[in-house]
Swiss-Prot record:
CDD domains: ALP. It is found in: Periplasm. Residues 1-21 form the signal peptide. NCBIfam families: PRK10518.1 (NF007810). Belongs to the alkaline phosphatase family. Its main location: periplasm. PROSITE patterns: ALKALINE_PHOSPHATASE (PS00123). This is Alkaline phosphatase. It catalyses: a phosphate monoester + H2O = an alcohol + phosphate. The keyword Phosphoprotein applies. Disulfide bonds join C190-C200, C308-C358. GO terms for molecular function: alkaline phosphatase activity; hydrogenase (acceptor) activity; magnesium ion binding; oxidoreductase activity, acting on phosphorus or arsenic in donors; phosphoprotein phosphatase activity; zinc ion binding. Gene3D superfamilies: Alkaline Phosphatase, subunit A (3.40.720.10).
Length: 471
């Protein structure tokens, strides 16, 4: 069916005056598992009835009190499908990612810095800048346009309006997606003072700039910041008020509550501007959920299919993405004005780069559990916009079991008891590359209808800004 036909079909729903969404369970929208035996006629159907009324009931144009934005880094349709096939089966569904009632697709190109023309394959920095500021920029830039001009982020605007703010990631907190909310630098590589002096000197404190990503993160002072990246906090400030002190010492002196494991995170009962929370759970990126062999040349033919195994480094001392999401919501929801929270499942992308299907799939399952927590809160609270999307598409493909692919492959045993082959073949280098196909965006709650149809990544900024009534 053409997109124009779908859009026309939705027009009566989108223009029906609705001021308040109904909150009872809507199984026709939320339960999308196959109805029965997939070998029987109708058994693979996911619809249990007409969804027109349920879609209408899900619409709301009232202001949102809270927004929870969940990003699957590198989570294109292929990554979602592969994870669903493996973990839930072909007829299964994700209770978070697949349960949001309103779905669309968005474009996500970057810009060439010199020409201003489209760069059809974005990186995470330009991508996150697009939804956090509403401005297209060049690959590698954070919080600035192609002319290197700063633009305020949705987190900065929410904080200025008195809302609580949160920034959660399984990556280093200096990595592109979390950094885009709090930093304005000409290169995403400027994690700490030393790298900033070398790679983006105009941003360095000694040159009158705003400092490194980590220094700007501390200045942004989100109420809750959770992730990896502890290593950079050991660097010493080379200029400014905190010159000679490590960034960790600076955080402590400025009143941050520092936690480093699941138990200490669990013990925190409040986080606000007087006592912001900074959780650093790894020197670099946080450990992934599942392990398995990387794809190799003709790996699906020369090697047996495998089942992914738990990562022993992801023990009980390491909070999961769902646990970090839960704690962030618990703490931020104490602000009567509301909150903005971004949650990133970062290593879908990183494991896709590494051609590691088990790593990639496990991180997608992790994100789904975080989405479930966000939806549970939103349905109970009644005034929260939940959005789930990605920053860019990626390299993995599902191919036939006997394919002699020119790239790297690995066979997996799925929940169905069948074999699924993952293929990675868009780079001869050690790292696979991003791709430029449009991405899924789905939402629940006030203003969720604005993700329907074809939008651009920058539209997400304006949708969130309008939903929260930010100026």
């Amino acid at each position: 069916m053409k997109q124009s036909t779908i859009a026309l079909a939705l027009l009566p729903l989108l223009f029906t005056p609705v001021t308040k969404a109904r909150t009872p369970e809507m199984p026709v929208l939320e339960n999308r598992a196959a109805q029965g035996d997939i070998t029987a006629p109708g058994g693979a159907r996911r619809l249990t009835g007409d969804q027109t009324a349920a879609l209408r009931d899900s619409l709301s144009d009232k202001p949102a009190k809270n927004i929870i934005l969940l990003i699957g880094d590198g989570m294109g349709d292929s990554e979602i499908t592969a994870a669903r096939n493996y973990a839930e089966g072909a007829g299964g569904f994700f209770k978070g990612i697949d349960a949001l009632p309103l779905t669309g697709q968005y474009t996500h190109y970057a810009l060439n810095k010199k020409t201003g023309k489209p760069d059809y394959v974005t990186d995470s920095a330009a991508s996150a800048t697009a939804w956090s500021t509403g401005v297209k920029t060049y690959n590698g830039a954070l919080g600035v346009d192609i002319h290197e001009k700063d633009h305020p982020t949705i987190l900065e605007m929410a904080k200025a309006a008195g809302l609580a703010t949160g920034n959660v990631s399984t990556a280093e907190l200096q990595d592109a997606t979390p950094a885009a909310l709090v930093a304005h630098v000409t290169s995403r590589k400027c994690y700490g003072p030393s790298a900033t002096s070398e790679k983006c000197p105009g941003n360095a404190l000694e040159k009158g700039g705003k400092g490194s990503i980590t220094e700007q993160l501390l200045n942004a002072r989100a109420d809750v910041t959770l992730g990896g990246g502890a290593k950079t906090f050991a660097e010493t400030a080379t200029a400014g008020e905190w010159q000679g002190k490590t960034l960790r010492e600076q955080a402590q002196a400025r009143g941050y509550q520092l936690v480093s494991d699941a138990a200490s995170l669990n013990s925190v009962t409040e986080a606000n501007q007087q006592k912001p929370l900074l959780g650093l759970f790894a020197d670099g990126n946080m450990p992934v959920r599942w392990l398995g062999p990387k794809a190799t040349y003709h790996g699906n033919i020369d090697k047996p299919a495998v089942t992914c195994t738990p990562n022993p480094q992801r023990n009980d001392s390491v909070p999961t993405l769902a646990q970090m999401t839960d704690k962030a919501i618990e703490l931020l929801s104490k602000n009567e004005k509301g909150f903005f929270l971004q949650v990133e499942g970062a290593s879908i992308d990183k494991q896709d780069h590494a051609a590691n299907p088990c790593g990639q799939i496990g991180e997608t399952v992790d994100l789904d559990e975080a989405v479930q927590r966000a939806l549970e809160f939103a349905k109970k609270e009644g005034n929260t916009l939940v959005i789930v999307t990605a920053d860019h598409a990626h390299a993995s493909q599902i191919v036939a079991p006997d394919t002699k692919a020119p790239g790297l492959t690995q066979a997996l045993n799925t929940k169905d008891g069948a074999v699924m082959v993952m293929s990675y073949g868009n780079s001869e280098e050690d790292s696979q590359e991003h791709t430029g196909s449009q991405l899924r965006i789905a939402a629940y709650g006030p203003h969720a209808a604005n993700v329907v149809g074809l939008t651009d990544q920058t539209d997400l900024f304006y949708t969130m800004k309008a939903a929260l009534g930010l100026k």
